[in-house]
């Protein structure tokens, strides 16, 4: 029974109290009493009122408390299976119900219709209003999927230990059935379900993350279903809890049941890792021919919520499509429970296909459909909203990835001719980049008055979520701040530090950052002065040494090689408590002189040489962050970082995506790659790189 509204409770209680107080004489007149004298109304009526009033107030408070407790409980966000755990990794029964049972409107579920792609942006804007209220309503209108199916096999005593979570089970009608092993009852069971794609029946298998006792079954399923691709959407541990048992060897070979699994290759990228396995059954009647299985492990899903941007997921999904053979069996997709992130991935794939085929998307209908195949697919309203964000990203920007062999033709199209640049194509691409919203609400620290004084350009402030944090000086507020941002590399998160050229009063902070974050490489892309304006305080000594705070910088070497000055500094921390071997480091600065005061470099070779020299230095000193600065820490700095990432990908994959590389940087620090000229320069450098290494094998 639903609790009464508080206003109704108040409306009910006051008349009742008035009746009880006002009718006291009526009640007295109807009573037969045996008192020896006449009653004293002046004494009995106030006494009764004083007794009843506290009781009524107490009743009212209790009813209000019950209502608000129920209301708060109903409004609590749907939690994922990873959020509520007992120490042994099993969900408590009461917490399970919050996952499984979704509130329903008493008037019945609301209807949701397909959205034409041209209306997608506006529909998302409407649904996102009021803290995504309409997205939550839409999500909560989804059927859970439990009513439509039975779970007899999953609930058998022999199979209960095979389920990671006792409330996330496969339907009998859509479960994956393994071959029965002789003498082992229920050995045909695994917690996995067939899931349809947009048009393809059973395109996917949605599975839980293998447990130690189900790893053999997992590989048996991969072999029997002829699957060639595994998509993994969880880390082995998150928040110190096991989400998935490691079901592959780090190197060499291992046998799981009767399936031998050998590692053939492993490539680690910033958002995901690709592992290649050779698998082969070991049978008494001889071995069958081995098969190649690719595992694509998405590593950028945070422990809480969803990825900050869908860019990484879209790149990952494209790589899955590229690597999965045409005639292979179902793609095996798993996270921990096999419903939340797994469902999110499958829905994005299906709706992208629908977008191409019908120029519309129908997320609500598709999620409802696949929940009939595996209950609770897409587990939270945040995941549901993320699906829409990914689809909008794809619709607005499309696929801008290029093979190196098609770059020249692409540039001709963008430029109109090979001699005179018709900037229409490039200008349109760059215009889309300028539409990337600057998230001022995420710049609170940099916009504090004390920290604004440390900014060279007040429009270029680091975001709070990836700013470089210094150790706080004792008794001195705001000393943990510097205008610097961590930026992802091609293979490694936080591979770069993008910062402004130090000011006279921030030099000490600059060297503290270099020391505390163990940066051995500095890339400088500006002169100290340009056009008679200060662009960067000279933070190093021309000869001898200089001390800033507790750090002494001594110059050991200064050589000029073409357009690059290479300076080696001996950096010493002057702290008595520090161990001697930890007090001294060598830091190398690459000062690029090839950037003119106005515009961009005339050719790309100087930048290619600079990037190569920096990468060689990193290999020798370890992959600590590379500190990159110009004057404001956005234009030339962003161009250098973008080119480093783009050229690294060209060498590794023979692919490039200048647009998404720059867009990703702008989501990490405002105004990265600041001008159309700098954006065009990125394309020019890649073309020069390909011309220099025209033999494809030289950089693939």
Curated annotation (Swiss-Prot):
It catalyses: O-phospho-L-tyrosyl-[protein] + H2O = L-tyrosyl-[protein] + phosphate. The chain crosses the membrane at residues 47-69. The active site is at 335 (phosphocysteine intermediate), 630 (phosphocysteine intermediate). A catalytically active cytoplasmic form (p65) is produced by proteolytic cleavage of either isoform 1, isoform 2 or isoform 3. Its EC number is 3.1.3.48. Residues 70-700 are cytoplasmic. Substrate binds at residues 303, 335-341, 379. Residues 135-394, 426-689 form the Tyrosine-protein phosphatase domain. Isoform 1 plays a critical role in signaling transduction pathways and phosphoprotein network topology in red blood cells. May play a role in osteoclast formation and function. This is Receptor-type tyrosine-protein phosphatase epsilon.
């Amino acid at each position: 029974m639903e609790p009464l509204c508080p206003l109704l409770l108040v409306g009910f209680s006051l008349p009742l109290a008035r009746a009880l107080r006002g009718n006291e004489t009526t009640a007295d007149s109807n009573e037969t009493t045996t008192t020896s004298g006449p009653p004293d109304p002046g004494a009995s009526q106030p006494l009764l009122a004083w007794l009843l009033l506290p009781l009524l107030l107490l009743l009212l408070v209790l009813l209000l408390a019950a209502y608000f407790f129920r209301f708060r409980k109903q409004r609590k966000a749907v939690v994922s299976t990873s959020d509520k755990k007992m120490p042994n990794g099993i969900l408590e029964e009461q917490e399970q119900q919050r996952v499984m049972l979704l509130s329903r409107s008493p008037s019945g579920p609301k209807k949701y219709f397909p959205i034409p792609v041209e209306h997608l942006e506006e529909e998302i804007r409407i649904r996102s209003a009021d803290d995504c209220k309409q997205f939550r309503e839409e999500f909560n209108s989804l059927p859970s999927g439990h009513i439509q199916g039975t779970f007899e096999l999953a609930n058998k005593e022999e199979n209960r230990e095979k389920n990671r979570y006792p409330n996330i089970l496969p339907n009998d009608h859509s479960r994956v059935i393994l071959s029965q092993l002789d003498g082992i009852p229920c050995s045909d069971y695994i917690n996995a379900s067939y899931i349809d794609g947009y048009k393809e029946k059973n395109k996917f298998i949605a599975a839980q993350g293998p447990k130690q006792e189900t790893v053999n079954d997992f590989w048996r399923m991969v072999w029997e279903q002829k699957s060639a691709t595994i998509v993994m959407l969880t880390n082995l541990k998150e928040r110190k809890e096991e989400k998935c048992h490691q079901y592959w060897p780090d190197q060499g070979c291992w046998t799981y049941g009767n399936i031998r699994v050998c590692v053939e290759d492993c490539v680690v990228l910033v958002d995901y890792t690709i592992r290649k396995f050779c698998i082969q059954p070991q049978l008494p009647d001889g071995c069958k021919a081995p098969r190649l299985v690719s595992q694509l492990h998405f590593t950028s899903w945070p422990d809480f919520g969803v990825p900050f941007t869908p860019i990484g997921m879209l790149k990952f999904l494209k790589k899955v499509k590229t690597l999965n053979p045409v005639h292979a069996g179902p793609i095996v997709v798993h996270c921990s429970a096999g419903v939340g992130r797994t469902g999110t991935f499958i829905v994005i794939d299906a709706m992208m296909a629908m977008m191409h085929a019908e120029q519309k998307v129908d997320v609500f209908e598709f999620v409802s459909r696949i929940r009939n195949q595996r209950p609770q697919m897409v587990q939270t309203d945040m995941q549901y909203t993320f699906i829409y964000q990914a689809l909008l990203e794809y619709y607005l920007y499309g696929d801008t990835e290029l093979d190196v062999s098609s770059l020249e033709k692409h540039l001709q199209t963008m430029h109109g001719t090979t001699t005179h640049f018709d900037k229409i194509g490039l200008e349109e691409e760059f215009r889309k980049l300028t539409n990337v919203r600057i998230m001022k609400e995420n710049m609170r620290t940099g916009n504090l008055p004390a920290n604004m004084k440390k900014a060279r350009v007040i429009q270029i402030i680091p975001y709070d979520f990836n700013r470089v944090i210094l150790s706080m000086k004792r008794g001195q507020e705001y000393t943990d701040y510097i205008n610097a941002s961590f930026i992802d590399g091609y293979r490694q998160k936080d591979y770069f530090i993008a910062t402004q050229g130090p000011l006279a009063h921030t030099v000490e902070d600059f060297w503290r950052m270099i020391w505390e974050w163990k940066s051995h490489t500095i890339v400088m892309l500006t002169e100290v002065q340009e056009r008679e304006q200060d662009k960067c305080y000279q933070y190093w000594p021309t000869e001898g040494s200089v001390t800033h705070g507790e750090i002494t910088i001594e110059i050991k070497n200064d050589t000029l090689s073409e357009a690059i000055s290479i300076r080696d500094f001996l950096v010493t921390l002057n702290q008595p408590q520090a161990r001697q071997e930890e007090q001294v480091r060598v830091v190398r600065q690459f000062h690029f002189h090839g950037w003119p005061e106005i515009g961009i470099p005339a050719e790309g070779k100087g930048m290619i040489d600079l990037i190569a020299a920096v990468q060689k230095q990193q290999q020798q000193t370890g992959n600590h962050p590379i500190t990159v600065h110009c004057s404001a820490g956005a234009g030339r700095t962003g161009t250098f970082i973008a080119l480093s990432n783009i050229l690294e990908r060209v060498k590794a994959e023979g692919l490039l995506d200048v647009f998404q590389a720059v867009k990703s940087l702008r989501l990490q620090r405002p105004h990265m790659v600041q001008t159309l000229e700098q954006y065009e320069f990125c394309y020019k450098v890649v073309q020069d790189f390909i011309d220099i290494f025209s033999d494809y094998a030289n950089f693939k």
